[in-house]
Amino acid sequence: MLKDIRKPFQYPKLPIDKKEGAKKRAKAKDTKGTLRRIWSYLAERKGLLILVMLMVVISAIFGLLGPFVIGKAIDHFIVGKTVSGLIPVLLLLLAIYIIQSLSLWFQNYWMITISQGTVFRMRSELFTHLHELPIPFFDKQRHGELMSRVTNDIENVSSTLNTSVIQILSSVITFVGTIAVMLYMSPLLTLITLTIIPVMAASLKWITNRTGKLFKEQQKNLGDLNGYIEESVSGAKVIKAYSREKQITAEFLEKNAALKTSGFWAQTISGFIPKVMNSLNNLSFTMIAAIGGLFALKGWISIGSIVVFAEYSRQFTRPLNDLANQFNTMLSAIAGAERVFDVLDEKEEREDEKNAVHQPIQTGSIEFRDVSFGYDKGQQTLKHLQFTVPAGQSIAFVGPTGAGKTTVTNLLARFYEPNDGKILIDGTDIKTLTRASLRKNMGFVLQDSFLFQGTIRENIRYGRLDASDQEVEAAAKTANAHSFIERLPKGYDTVLTQNGSGISQGQKQLISIARAVLADPVLLILDEATSNIDTVTEVNIQEALARLMEGRTSVIIAHRLNTIQRADQIVVLKNGEMIEKGSHDELIRQKGFYSDLYESQFEK
């Protein structure tokens, strides 16, 4: 993921004007709305679409010419018992089928170009939009289910565009052209053939009314299953540690069975379409053969015309059959497209205030003024929180799980906005600053140190993309990471797998600290940065953090109190309220909650 990350990325041409994009693409809440929205993407390639339609018309016309010429040839050569002029007719047929084949090839080539370009745009727009969404959206979504929308659902749309659009256009043109030729040859036989259309339409409506919901349910169940698989793979160690293999398998089988059931009924009911169409097709052919034979005996129509008409009756029902078959894939693709558009319709992270300024943090002083916040309405996570951190000093937050410690950092980085109160940095309300300028001057070292797939050098350089190799190594030395990196077979060029599996949790943390060192932030956020670490590694991390915190305003969150004793201020939170505040020594002398917590940990 980090490969060539320093190279400038060329974004695809996406709608920059969000209001304009919203006007062009109405929200997809139904089938018609989704189709209109898909068309808005296709319409951007009108030139190629016109060429595709032209090729479809040519292939359909020449497809109709072939049987007509054959019918005339039967009357002339077989009924007339002569071979005079046979070669020109054969050459004519050869030319017809060559032109038809070439037009088919071009229409497929251009349609693939259109569909791949459209899907590229949709996928790019979806991925870009995902990273414009606020953190609360991701907190409420399963990552595997989101991945299913970016991959499976869009691929479903892609495969449908590749085949269905051409098939539908071709079927409509062939259907209209066939009826026109049939009317020219025999209006009476044409009327007899058309009697099956009401039966076809009624059958198709009955089936599609039932399969639409089933295909939507199938796509939903597929997303749920993908999310569960992603979760189980990510948590494989925990599953094995607690011997939950049987339980996880049982839950998987339950979700897999739900997908199987919805898929079974969607495919079974939609599978009736070709069966019904084929039966009606055979009925139509039988009627044409019987009635056409009687007409031929009476001399009302030639033998060649009967043969051609019978073939046209096949061609008449074939496009209807093809259209019916395309409903399966179309319904599935529409269901997938709706899931994609649901994400695209999610509101992006709240825009910066109109007068927000792009201003770097100068000193990093922090002030919370009567700040209250709740993730859910009616439930406050933080209540009237007030504190001040002078520039260059550190403040630590302690308290039981759910007290609101991490929420403080979420608000400080504007991942969430407070319900009440103000947060000031350098005396300026952070709402008046752009999020980009605010976060650019912050460094994060979190409990779960996320590393991207790529080399160690690339992961450290993520803190500052234009950093030289020497600066990367200097940052690693400051973070006490250089020695263990050098011991690896390929050193800084060691490739890490997803999320850094292959190195220890402590080593991941040291790389994360090196990344923060390289970023050179004014304000530092350490969220449980030394939890779940062995004692020796913790010493290295503590030394690295001490160097990193020097001269920087630092916000520390920790459960292990021995890691925050040197903090300038310690705030004790309980049920979202600040119940104690002071230095370590002051809080110990108070003999309150912090003192009891410290003594309990010290005794352990």
Swiss-Prot record:
The chain crosses the membrane at residues 50-70, 86-106, 172-192, 288-308, 510-530. This is Uncharacterized ABC transporter ATP-binding protein YfiC. Keywords: ATP-binding, Cell membrane, Membrane, Nucleotide-binding, Transmembrane, Transmembrane helix, Transport. Residues 49-332 form the ABC transmembrane type-1 domain. It is found in: Cell membrane. Belongs to the ABC transporter superfamily. The keyword ATP-binding applies. Its main location: membrane. GO terms for cellular component: plasma membrane. One of its GO terms (molecular function) is ATP hydrolysis activity. ATP binds at G399, P400, T401, G402, A403, G404, K405, T406.
